[in-house]
Swiss-Prot record:
E.C. numbers: 1.14.14.137
Mode of membrane association: Single-pass membrane protein
Catalytic activity annotation: 2-cis-(+)-abscisate + reduced [NADPH--hemoprotein reductase] + O2 = (+)-8'-hydroxyabscisate + oxidized [NADPH--hemoprotein reductase] + H2O + H(+)
GO-annotated biological processes: abscisic acid catabolic process; abscisic acid metabolic process
Protein name in the entry: Abscisic acid 8'-hydroxylase 1
Species assigned in the record: Oryza sativa subsp. japonica
Protein's job: Involved in the oxidative degradation of abscisic acid.
Keywords for this protein: Endoplasmic reticulum, Heme, Iron, Membrane, Metal-binding, Monooxygenase, Oxidoreductase, Stress response, Transmembrane, Transmembrane helix
Gene this chain is encoded by: CYP707A5
Induction (record text): By ethylene treatment and by flooding.
Amino acid sequence: MGAFLLFVCVLAPFLLVCAVRGRRRQAGSSEAAACGLPLPPGSMGWPYVGETFQLYSSKNPNVFFNKKRNKYGPIFKTHILGCPCVMVSSPEAARFVLVTQAHLFKPTFPASKERMLGPQAIFFQQGDYHAHLRRIVSRAFSPESIRASVPAIEAIALRSLHSWDGQFVNTFQEMKTYALNVALLSIFGEEEMRYIEELKQCYLTLEKGYNSMPVNLPGTLFHKAMKARKRLGAIVAHIISARRERQRGNDLLGSFVDGREALTDAQIADNVIGVIFAARDTTASVLTWMVKFLGDHPAVLKAVTEEQLQIAKEKEASGEPLSWADTRRMKMTSRVIQETMRVASILSFTFREAVEDVEYQGYLIPKGWKVLPLFRNIHHNPDHFPCPEKFDPSRFEVAPKPNTFMPFGNGTHSCPGNELAKLEMLVLFHHLATKYRWSTSKSESGVQFGPFALPLNGLPMSFTRKNTEQE
């Protein structure tokens, strides 16, 4: 009986959503007939559940999307997770949705995600308030603002690498720790370190419940996550209060509490927590894939190591620390980052929702339908990237065609922290490539799919510091 009740609790919300979305699907079809425009080609699958089972029956969801694209073309309809959807997989269509007609498509997230991160976070906004938040975040994470952070980021990188030395670790989990520490530094600066450990613990509890069923009952992951979110908000509110009294700080929090920005404490807290969320897993995923790809391609690793050794030798001779200018000289390593983001395509797609009926290339996208630009399909299109499955950083010696490479999204909702993400990758690999060796078990090959595509089991790796006489 207990198992049955649990089954009902888990399944009932999904069935309710399916039923509501099923009615919307029928409404969309009727609207298409009424206005004389056809829906995009495709299949809506079974009543209520659509093609959800087909999507998840494949260990690799990209197989599902590729099959649909090959059959129907770069724009097609489907029905997954209770939602009628239009998938777009051409650079032109992605630009239409994310840039030129972005006002017709709003970002969409489950209500439970908004509750966890905070309803006033930048992800969930449009219009003037979103533009205001984006200006603040972009200013705080601009090259001019983060260039002075190199020594502090380098210190975090060195501590991380030292803790891995001689250990067999889960690479993804260690990269998440590194990315979280950099995120907290960039948000709060170095003056709020006394709160950092409690912030981390609350955030980690929140993260565990992020993809859980939103059932707020004692003992559930969701309930624990919401308690952690409340405590996290209280800690951030305390830090905000102290910072307002000081009225200084070149970090993100300093930008938020600037009296000219007119943000409430609740708005600031939601956005601080949202930025922590955005800054952690995606960056850690790219770093994990970089370790994997460099280990699989010795010639590329050799080129990266030689580039970094040249910079390291110059730093040693001058007695100066690593600087922002040094990271601008890391051309080969930067191309490795780009190619890693293309091949791995950490963000395979993004969700939007049509706010009104939209016509695109003679097709109707009905109001309320989800629209998913498929970044991975665009990044793996051989018309734009020959031999797309091959890891070849040299392809970025020439800039890709517009809208064919969108690792940070595109338009007003693209990632405003992309320069910080690239900086922390460059700093970490400067020391990793010059000072450490790594290896993994051959049995650990493979890919696992969750919110992000990752090497199997988070890429367990052994890291060992090189001897001083080794290159």
